[in-house]
Amino acid sequence: MRIFLLFLFWILASQVQAQEIEARAYSNAPIGINFASVGIGQASSGNYKLTTEAASFTRIFDAWGQSGKVSLVLPYAELTGTGKLGSQTINASSEGLSDPLIKASVNLYGAPALNLDQFKNYQQDLIIGASLAASIPWGQYSSQQMLNVGANRWFIQPGLGASKAVGPWRFELAGAATIYTSNNSFLGGNTLSQNPIYSTQTHAIYYFPNTAWLSADATYYFGGQTFLNGTPVGGQQENWRFGATFSYPIDPRNSIRIYGSTGAYSRTNNSYDLIGISWQFRWGGGM
């Protein structure tokens, strides 16, 4: 029973956000540009669905001569579903603000800080960058509920990545470690803790002449042994996921993005499917 609860809590309240596949995480853009986006995504596992509407803001800045960016994501989520555990019916019904995410990344090599006019002559070769993300436990959470859209714990996620340009192609490789604090108000007055999850992801991105792009995505992650009051439960995670992302520019300021991914292998049977769409608007930086 406890393993079942931990599995659902972890995959639907934590894993989807922490292990998101993100193409073009390390790329260059003109200094001073702002991006605002809104979107909707749905993760499903068995009879359970987590639908998330999110708004985000990103700003590009000069980081010691290289470009950097800072992003804030505000998600709102609805968790629904019904399942069986023996003769017991397990209902999921939770809705509200999910945990906000803040992320900063700095390019260390190959992405000079350029204004809009200078950027028109920029040609990418090799970019190397670093990032740090954190999830803030402000989401809807009740220790009396089995499942929640908030995790009631922090995570921080340092990462490193590289992007190599070959003609119209971009080949990316990135790695990260997701480190969790404990949830001291888990169901029944228990304490839930988890070891770090280590992940790597890779992308092959093709750019079309109109700047639309299509990415084939893959990620592998492992670790994340869970503990209930210090006792190991649930087993160590090991997962492969594959997906695709397509971005299309409507005009110089607006674009849409469609994405999807699916679990190809899961050591502990905690795979899920994810689909979503978002709209992005950009301004500033002399546009």
What are these regions (language model features)?
Residues 78-193, 235:
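Outer-membrane pore/translocation modules
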Residues 38-40, 55-59, 102-108, 132, ...:
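Residues on the lipid-exposed face of transmembrane beta-strands in outer-membrane beta-barrel proteins
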Residues 31-37, 65-73, 99-101, 119-131, ...:
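Outer-membrane beta-barrel architecture
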Residues 31, 43, 62-66, 109-111, ...:
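Outer-membrane beta-barrel channels and translocator barrels
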